[in-house]
């Protein structure tokens, strides 16, 4: 899967180091390897975008290294490929040596994995499953400001799935821990790879069942029920959180007409 780049190799270039990628002109570079000084570098093709290959190069550039968040408002498919590249780059960087025997490892030629030639151990990229849920109560939606969101954004509740827990159990637990609310009528909506750092967001909607809001101050700054036409500052378009909010708001509005 890995190859040495030649002058005329072309496509989209994910040049990544330590969970950042190279974004000259604030966008993912497209063109020939020679155009970006990549001739002779090792690269992996990790997908196709608009019929052109997407290449991953493990390299740090002196400037224009930025978070993949800068691509979040672009096409979802391109953002997903960029996220894959950043996650794979970090996986290869952090798995140079075997955790069991300490010997140097090498990439598999057939799958996204690192192999130890000494003890034959095989490592795969770690993915952290998360849940995210929009909760409706009549014509209102539960929105919260998280401690990590200091910009005033309100969003839906989310959290990591714990060991030995189903997705449904994780939703109920996270909602209760963060807001003291019980839910019912849980429904799966969609999923979204989320490279911050290596998550897979699993999105649900649910209805309010019982309880009064009591926030976990370690996780939330504020939370409340917001009528569909009186919403606070929301997450950016392109995020699964924004989709959940918009879907819930649309149902509230339709039922109110």
Curated annotation (Swiss-Prot):
Binding site for a divalent metal cation 2: 174
Enzyme class: hydrolase
Segments carrying motif Nudix box: 159-180
Organism (species): Cronobacter sakazakii (strain ATCC BAA-894) (Enterobacter sakazakii)
Biological processes annotated in GO: NAD catabolic process; NADH metabolic process; NADP catabolic process
Gene designation per UniProt: nudC
Name this polypeptide is given: NAD-capped RNA hydrolase NudC
EC number(s) per entry: 3.6.1.-, 3.6.1.22
Domain Nudix hydrolase: 125-248
HAMAP family assigned to the protein according to its UniProt record, in alphabetical order: Nudix_NudC
PROSITE patterns: NUDIX (PS51462), NUDIX_BOX (PS00893)
Keywords: Hydrolase, Magnesium, Manganese, Metal-binding, NAD, Zinc
Function: mRNA decapping enzyme that specifically removes the nicotinamide adenine dinucleotide (NAD) cap from a subset of mRNAs by hydrolyzing the diphosphate linkage to produce nicotinamide mononucleotide (NMN) and 5' monophosphate mRNA. The NAD-cap is present at the 5'-end of some mRNAs and stabilizes RNA against 5'-processing. Has preference for mRNAs with a 5'-end purine. Catalyzes the hydrolysis of a broad range of dinucleotide pyrophosphates.
Superkingdom per UniProt: Bacteria
Residue sites binding Zn(2+) per the record: 98, 101, 116, 119
Co-factor(s): Mg(2+); Mn(2+); Zn(2+)
A Pfam family that the UniProt record links to this protein: Zn_ribbon_NUD
A GO CC term attached to the entry: cytosol
